[in-house]
């Protein structure tokens, strides 16, 4: 028999102590995400810069090497704004992130004729080439800051999953989409910065 340590007041407001505690995952994060969004579009890296001469001033400027980073960030911002509930306040606490990027498999990986939908056996199973996974994460994290999902991407303190796969893995690998894009989840980090905890 459980004996209460104090008597609850009859205020009509449920006690916060009566709530079921949130379950935590294996790495100290809450099992239900704070924020979740599915973004469609071609993921693009951010971070590689090229020197270009300004036609008007003649000065050298550093510009993003990938022209696709702007449209990708716009896709992330638009999807994140749609996914945010009304009255959303940007996250201000440390978060753990999961990002599963889906890339379109190049046409050269497929057969021809009646085998046009079949991946050639000689094609790579994984996208172990450009774009770099870390640069995909960088562009996506910055876009989430722009969408005010969190105050700053410096709040990302760990990754639960950071994955890139081809769209042909849809249904075989969790969160791989049927078309190019990304599944993003953010969790609060429980016990962050508690010494000895």
Question: What is each stretch, according to the model?
Answer:
Residues 1-197:
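Acidic, proline/glycine-enriched N-terminal capping motif
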């Amino acid at each position: 028999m459980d004996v209460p340590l104090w008597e609850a007041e009859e205020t009509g407001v449920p006690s916060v102590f009566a709530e079921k505690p949130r379950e935590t995952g294996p790495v100290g994060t809450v099992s239900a995400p704070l924020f979740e969004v599915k973004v469609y579009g071609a993921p693009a890296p951010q971070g590689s810069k090229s020197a270009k001469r300004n036609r008007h001033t003649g000065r050298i400027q550093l510009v993003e090497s990938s022209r696709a980073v702007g449209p990708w960030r716009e896709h992330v911002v638009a999807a994140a704004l749609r996914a945010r509930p009304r009255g959303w306040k940007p996250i201000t606490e440390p978060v753990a992130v999961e990002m599963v990027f889906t890339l379109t498999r190049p046409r050269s990986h497929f057969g021809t004729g009646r085998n046009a939908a079949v991946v050639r056996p000689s094609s790579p199973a994984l996208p172990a080439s450009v774009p770099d996974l870390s640069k995909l994460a960088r562009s996506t994290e910055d876009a989430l800051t722009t969408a005010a999902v969190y105050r700053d991407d410096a709040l990302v303190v760990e990754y639960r999953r950071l994955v890139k796969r081809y769209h042909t893995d849809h249904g075989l690998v969790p969160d791989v989409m049927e078309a190019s894009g990304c599944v993003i989840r953010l969790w609060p980090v429980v016990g962050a910065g508690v010494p000895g905890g």
